[in-house]
Structures are given as structure tokens and as C-alpha cells.
UniProtKB/Swiss-Prot annotation:
Signal peptide: none annotated. It is an enzyme of class 3 (hydrolase). This is Probable acid phosphatase SPBC4.06. Keywords: Hydrolase, Mitochondrion. It comes from Schizosaccharomyces pombe (strain 972 / ATCC 24843). It comes from the Eukaryota.
Length: 462
């Protein structure tokens, strides 16, 4: 969603198989991913050789439609062209002489369609073939929950990931359901449009980043870039374009293999610029609980509740989907990791992905069953006083809840590498801090829940 982007994600040469303790059984999986490579969201750096028109959207030539009277959905092909007005009134379009396959601003490029499909194929190799957690064929669309933001590139990326995970030959006829929300209800990214207070926080931390990094950018970076910016120096916030916009365009070009002035590929310049922009956008998550609450708290609680609901359904023998896929953005990935103190403070590349895996420790089941009689007796002795029924009921519920969660664990992998959440350091499963007790994860995200979201989002008068 933001104007910053980075290079493409790298998939491992060999897909890992079982890389967790054998006592643990994978039960539930949520995958949150950034969309694939896209065109810049705005025309910039033409003087550096970055073209206005990107002829990299040749695959955007079909859509699904159901024709009246037909039982099946059909693929309708079309030739798409981008037209431009001939004058400032924007009323009179040009004649039909534009090339085919030109991307509109922010559109998923052909490269982005490939990498998101590759992500789906990676997930298939790992969770279907290697771990045998997911079925080879998807015969019931209720077994998967899918959701994307209203941004077309996020929705299309989700479609490509799903198609890589379950190609047409591996799923039943018909169409799966993809859920979206109105922007006023969207929490699959930090929703600045719906939260004025979050906008204020971003502005405050952007100014802080400018004070920290503008002196650094005043040297070599400005010398390199000023020729492409009408002689002006590079600044985090006050230059035009601002630094995040420059870096977004550069990395969008790198991601989709668009050629441009080699000076802009200088590694030190790109690293300094990335450090400053990451601080601008996500430095606040290091120090502000409110930033975490408004930027990621609602989504984290959604993710946690799905895992908790699965545990309850598993205990009751009720049906519940085992897989959730979320088409999201760079800011989604970073906000989640930063709010959990697990972020490396590098901008998430295109098609970055988080796998949130829920495990059950099955080795303790037999022990708990053997002790169930003693536990029931103890419970009866503890809660036999009728005068305290109400309070005891709450204690029993809390006790049962803790017991229900005691054998369940969460692991988050970021671009195929497990991460350690801050609250789980020293608390992991048998010394493995990447495998976090579900109870600790739940308590951590509950503390970030924006209970009165709309009240908390009201701007503060300055």
C-alpha cells in the first residue's frame, strides 16, 4: 500500500521438510504475504531512464464472467490498452495508437504474477508434498479461508498464490470465495485512511527520522541524486519526490528488471536510503504501544482468534478450515513483525510471506488422559462452595482455557526463516524460542487490541 518497495523475495533452493520437533503436530496454517512486483505508483525519475510506460502487463488480458443461461464460468479474453488525454482538460483521449500490455500505476507486472504463483508452488511443495499437512486435491472450498485488501494487486496476488498451491487440475469445479472488506473496516494493513491518529503518529515519526538521517543524506546521496531532482538535495520528508517515493520507483524497476541509470543501483546509496525510510515508516513501532495498537493490533487479534477458534473446534470435534491465505502489503508484514519485536528493520521484498503455524504437542495427550480422573476430583473439591458459584465459574473457565492452550504452540516464519518473537525469548518449546506457547502469543496480542478503535483513532489537537 505504501510508496516504498524493495527487491524481490528469494525462495530457498530446497524446500524444507519437517523442521520442528517430532512431538509437535502441525494443525493450522495462516499465510500472510505481500503482493508481487508492480509498476511504480507514480511517474518518477524519467531523467534517470525509468520509462513512463512499462510494457510489462501482457498477462492482464482476461477475466472470469458468467454468461446468462450458462452454468459454468467462462474466461473472456480481451486486448487492453492504456489511453492518455491530449490536453489538460482530461476530456479528449488520444487515438488508438498505444501499445498493448502497458501497466497502469501500481499494477502487478508479469514478473509479479510469476513470483506470486511461485509462492503458491512453494507452499504446495512444503505443506502438501513434504509435510503432507494439506491434501493433494482440494475438494471442499470451505477448507480454506482467503482474504485480500481491496487493492487489485493484492487480490490478483492472492489468486496467483492460490493457483500455485492448488492448480485447476487439483481442485474441484466452481469458484473459491475470497473475502474483502470496505476500506472503513479494513485491518489487513495499517489503515491510515480510517485512522487520523495513526496518520499523526506516522507524521511524528517521519519528522524524527528526518532529523536523524537528513544529515547522512546530505552528503554522497544528494550528490548522486540531485542531477535527477532538478539540483535539489535528497531529504527523508521535505524533498520532492520524498525519499520513500524515490526508493519505491527504483526498487520497482529493479524488481521487474527495468533498465535505468546505473548510478542509482549503488549499494551504499540504496542501503542508506532504505535505513532512513524504514525508520520513517516503522521506527514508531519500536517505542509506541499506540502505534502497535492502531497499526497492527486489530489484525493480530484476528489471527490469534482464528487459532484459538481452531483449538476449540478441534477439542469439540467441530469442522474448521485448516488454511488461511491473506493477500496484503509490505506495511502489513513489517507492522506484524515490528509489533511482535521480531522485525529485522529491512524493507519487506515483493512477495514476502509470513507463515503462522499452529502446533499441538501430542506427546502430552496420553499423560493428560491418565490424570483426568484426578483432575476432575480436584476440581470438585476446589469449587464445591455454592456461595461462590459466580466467581468460581470464572476461575474454572480461566483454568480450562489455560489448560486447553497449554499444549499448543505458534511459530512464525518470515521468508522461510523462523523468527523469535520478543515475548517468547526464553519461553520457547524445549528451549526453541521460535516455537512460542499459544498462551503467550495470545496474551501479547490481547495487550495490543484497540478495544475502542474509533475513539483511539481520533486526532489529537496540537
Amino acid at each position: 500500500m505504501s510508496q516504498m518497495s524493495s527487491a524481490s523475495v528469494k525462495f530457498p533452493d530446497s524446500v524444507p521438510g519437517v523442521d520442528y520437533p517430532k512431538q509437535l503436530q502441525l494443525k493450522y496454517l495462516q499465510v500472510i504475504f505481500r503482493h508481487g512486483e508492480r509498476a511504480p505508483v507514480k511517474e518518477r525519475l524519467g531523467s534517470a531512464g525509468i520509462p513512463k510506460d512499462w510494457k510489462l502487463c501482457n498477462n492482464a488480458r482476461r477475466f472470469f464472467a458468467q454468461i446468462k443461461g450458462e452454468k459454468e464460468w467462462s474466461v473472456l479474453g480481451f486486448e487492453r490498452k492504456v489511453e492518455s488525454p491530449v490536453d489538460t482538460s482530461l476530456a479528449a483521449p488520444t487515438s488508438d495508437n498505444s501499445p498493448s500490455g502497458v501497466c497502469i500505476h501500481g499494477e502487478l507486472t508479469d514478473f509479479g504474477r510469476v513470483t506470486t504463483r511461485t509462492l503458491g508452488e512453494y507452499l504446495r511443495e512444503r505443506y502438501v508434498k513434504q509435510l503432507k499437512f494439506l491434501p493433494d486435491e482440494l475438494n471442499n472450498y470451505a477448507d480454506v479461508y482467503m482474504r485480500a485488501t481491496p487493492m487489485v494487486r493484492a487480490l490478483e496476488s492472492l489468486e496467483h498464490v492460490f493457483s500455485g498451491l492448488y492448480p485447476e487440475s487439483k481442485r474441484k469445479m466452481g469458484l473459491p470465495v475470497i473475502f474483502t472488506r470496505n476500506w472503513s473496516d479494513e485491518n489487513l494493513l495499517p489503515n491510515e485512511n480510517n485512522c487520523p491518529r495513526l496518520v499523526q503518529l506516522y507524521e511524528e515519526f517521519a519528522e524524527r527520522a528526518a532529523k536523524l538521517y537528513d544529515p547522512l543524506l546530505a552528503g554522497r546521496a544528494s550528490e548522486m541524486m540531485s542531477q535527477f531532482m532538478n539540483g535539489q538535495p535528497v531529504r527523508v520528508v521535505s524533498s520532492h519526490p520524498r525519499l520513500s517515493g524515490l526508493l519505491d520507483t527504483i526498487n520497482a524497476a529493479i524488481g521487474s528488471h527495468v533498465d535505468f541509470n546505473p548510478n542509482l543501483r549503488d549499494e551504499q546509496w540504496l542501503r542508506d536510503a532504505e535505513t532512513a525510510v524504514v525508520e520513517e515508516w516503522f521506527g514508531g513501532y519500536k517505542v509506541s504501544k499506540l502505534m502497535r495498537q492502531l497499526g497492527a493490533g486489530s489484525l493480530l487479534n484476528d489471527l490469534s482468534m482464528r487459532m484459538e477458534n481452531f483449538v476449540v473446534a478441534e477439542k469439540n470435534g467441530s469442522p474448521y478450515h485448516r488454511l488461511a491465505l491473506y493477500g496484503a502489503h509490505d506495511v502489513t508484514i513489517a507492522a506484524i513483525l515490528a509489533s511482535l519485536d521480531a522485525f529485522d528493520y529491512r524493507w519487506p521484498p515483493f512477495t514476502s510471506h509470513l507463515e503462522m503455524e499452529l502446533f499441538e504437542d501430542t506427546s502430552s495427550k496420553s499423560d493428560s488422559q491418565n490424570q483426568s480422573g484426578d483432575n476432575k476430583t480436584t476440581d470438585l473439591k476446589l469449587f464445591s462452595d455454592e456461595s461462590t458459584d459466580a466467581s468460581n465459574s470464572a476461575i474454572v473457565a480461566a483454568s480450562n482455557s489455560a489448560r486447553d492452550m497449554s499444549d499448543w504452540y505458534v511459530r512464525i516464519t518470515y521468508n522461510s526463516t523462523p523468527v523469535v518473537m520478543g515475548a517468547c525469548r526464553g519461553q520457547g518449546y524445549k528451549g526453541n524460542d521460535t516455537i512460542c506457547p499459544l498462551s503467550i502469543f495470545k496474551d501479547t496480542v490481547r495487550a495490543l487490541k484497540p478495544v475502542e478503535y474509533h475513539t483511539m483513532c481520533k486526532p489529537v489537537k496540537k
